[in-house]
A protein has these predicted regions:
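Alpha/propeptide regions of enzymes that mature by internal proteolysis
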Residues: 22-264
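Bacterial Sec-dependent N-terminal signal peptides
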Residues: 1-26
Length: 264
């Protein structure tokens, strides 16, 4: 069976940049990223559009630096997503959209294709970089998914950086929340992610999100559900999905792509 290097499944309108197939000596590495910035109009000012593009390009450079220097795919996807979580233009970390209560609840997941080890967190409110907490779940616990208060307590034990909730309340998201609150509407777009193949032939995937704007508090989408929105297997592919999370969960999209490749 011919091994496919990377498969990335995306839905809806996204800003997507990819840097793929470069050689480092005789060995190839691949990096593909996506950045979900909520309901972005096609008519946004050029200056704002450039912020998204510049952010994605910088994220690519971060991942490229790691991979060209022999770093692991897992390190690359984590650091790329760290950067996107810190960038206010994207729906993850600092730029996370708000729930119907006007609060932030973030989800993230990371997976290694080497041994299928995975970690995920959901309902995170005060961790600056949820993707790094997800990696600690994979590496420091026998579990795969931690949620809410338990995940926050684990973050304290691991001395993960936390921030006050006001860190996440950027003006653009607050204004959009007020607008949607009046309309009693929902926004089903968002999420940032990365998949990578390192020079040793190992795959990894990472995904982080603030979820959908105006979601009911406690709602968890596909991102932290391994096999739905995030998956990596060295035998097949690495997947970071974005779109309407409930659809990905119902159809187990990420692992289904992998299985189709495996059994073809």
């Amino acid at each position: 069976m011919k091994k496919s290097i990377i498969t990335v499944f995306l839905t809806l309108l996204l800003i997507i940049q990819s840097f793929a197939g470069e050689n480092n000596g005789d060995k190839k590495y691949v990096l593909v990223i996506h950045g979900g910035a909520g309901a972005v109009s096609r008519d946004i000012p050029e200056s704002l559009k450039q912020e998204y593009i510049d952010g994605l390009n910088q994220a690519l450079l971060i991942g490229k630096s790691i991979l060209t220097n022999g770093g692991s795919a897992l390190d690359a996807v984590e650091k790329v997503v760290n950067y996107l979580e810190d960038h206010p233009s994207f729906n993850a970390g600092k730029g996370s959209v708000l729930t119907s209560d006007g609060t932030v609840e973030m989800d993230a997941a990371i997976m290694s294709g080497i041994d299928l080890s995975a970690g995920a967190v959901a309902g995170i409110k005060n961790v600056k970089n949820p993707i790094s907490l997800a990696r600690l779940v994979a590496e420091k616990t026998p579990h795969v998914l931690l949620i809410g208060e338990g995940a926050e307590k684990f973050a304290d034990e691991m001395k993960v950086q936390k921030v006050d909730s006001t860190y996440f309340f950027i003006r653009a998201q607050n204004e959009r929340w007020k607008e949607l609150k009046k309309k009693i509407s929902e926004d089903k777009k968002g999420t940032v992610g990365a998949v990578a193949l390192d020079i040793n032939g190992n795959l990894a995937a990472a995904t982080s999100t603030g979820g959908m704007m105006m979601k009911r508090p406690g709602r968890v989408g596909d991102v932290p559900i391994i096999g739905a929105g995030t998956y990596a297997n060295n035998k097949t592919c690495a997947v970071s999905a974005t779109g309407w999370g409930e659809k990905f969960i119902k159809n187990n999209v990420a692992v289904s792509i992998s299985k189709l490749m495996e059994y073809k």
